[in-house]
Amino acid sequence: MITIKIGGSVVDNLHPTTISDIKKVAEQEGVILVHGGGKEVTKVTEQLGKEPKFVVSPSGIKSRYTDKETSEIFTMVMSGRINKAIVQMLQKNDVNAVGL
């Protein structure tokens, strides 16, 4: 089993070569694909009229401040929009995929 992490910027422009590479790996061993999508979460949050909030740790790491409403938006975007689009692309390319 191998885990592959693709960032939100890759998700935004998922190239056919990336799908092909994932397919090749999946044919050899099981794959868990983890995706980002923070920019899309921010975009949808703003479209819904809510201002995104972020916090910065003492070491300089920026993180999204997630209240209940933001958590619901995050879930909607990540598992509803992004996850489903990735699964659809993988399945169109004969990769057996399910989104969780």
Language model regions located:
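Nucleotide/pyrophosphate-binding catalytic subdomain
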Residues: 1-100
